[in-house]
Regions:
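Bacterial N-terminal signal peptides that target proteins for export
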Residues: 1-9
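Ser/Thr-rich, Proline-interspersed low-complexity disordered segments
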Residues: 31-40
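Bacterial lipoprotein signal-peptidase II cleavage site
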Residues: 5, 18-32
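Short aromatic-glycine motifs in intrinsically disordered, low-complexity regions
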Residues: 114-125
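Bacterial N-terminal signal peptides
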Residues: 11-18
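Extracytosolic secretory-pathway proteins
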Residues: 39-110, 123, 133-221
Length: 221
């Protein structure tokens, strides 16, 4: 990983970008009143190129129960993994993050965390929906992705999940050169709920449904 700032600054930018650490249902995690453009403001810390490690989501029991009630079966797409413990794991394939002094620019955390070539599927009622190529926007507390239904593209870069960081735990730095952020709650967005309800002929899925709790692990060296 190309680190452009000292390790203290790196810790700050990881914490700020960690699945929208301060996100809530009613406010964006890294939004502040604009005081300067990014052309004049300089970031306090920056990760120009994210490489490797994962974003994992431990599926919530309520979500799993809802899938069972709707007779929907989850699966993986591409390089994703579904662990025996019930976590969906998506490799981080790229991205970049800049962290500005809050109040100087809006949003003060900018960039993206990419998960190209992986995703998960829901199958039921003769239909199969695949959600893939996730992109985390740490400034907006949103995860977007591509959606296909029975192999046909239904949406590209659609807002799928809200990332609520109010339950986020402190950053953990490990001896193996990684940093771990755990505790962000992943919730279904209205756009995704509407698409899934329409596809599977139900109205049971609602915005705000808790999908699970996320853990993001990135390389720091």
């Amino acid at each position: 990983m190309n680190i452009k700032f000292p390790i203290a600054g790196l810790t700050a930018v990881i914490a700020a970008a960690g699945l929208a650490a301060c996100g809530s249902d009613t406010s964006d995690s890294a939004t502040a009143a604009p005081a300067a453009s990014t052309q004049t403001a300089k970031p306090l810390a920056e990760i120009p190129s994210l490489t490797g490690r994962t974003t994992a989501v431990a599926l919530d029991a309520g979500f799993v129960e809802a899938l069972g009630t709707l007779k929907l079966t989850p699966g993986t797409v591409g390089d994703a993994e579904l662990t025996k413990a019930g976590s969906l794991v998506f490799p981080i394939t790229g991205g970049n993050v800049k962290y500005y002094k809050p109040g100087t620019v809006s949003p003060y955390v900018q960039g993206e965390i990419d998960h190209e070539g992986s995703g998960f599927s829901l199958t039921g009622g003769g239909k199969k929906v695949e959600l893939t190529d996730f992109v985390i926007d740490p400034g907006k507390s949103v995860l977007t992705g591509n959606v296909s239904v029975d192999g046909e593209e239904a949406a590209k870069g659609a807002p799928l999940f809200f990332l609520d960081g109010r339950t986020l735990e402190p950053l953990k730095a490990n001896d193996d050169g990684t940093a771990v952020l755990e505790g962000t709650t992943v919730k279904l967005k209205q756009e995704a709920a509407d698409l899934l309800n329409q596809t599977f002929g139900t109205d049971a899925l609602e915005a705000g449904l808790v999908i699970g709790v996320a853990t993001i692990t990135v390389n720091t060296a």
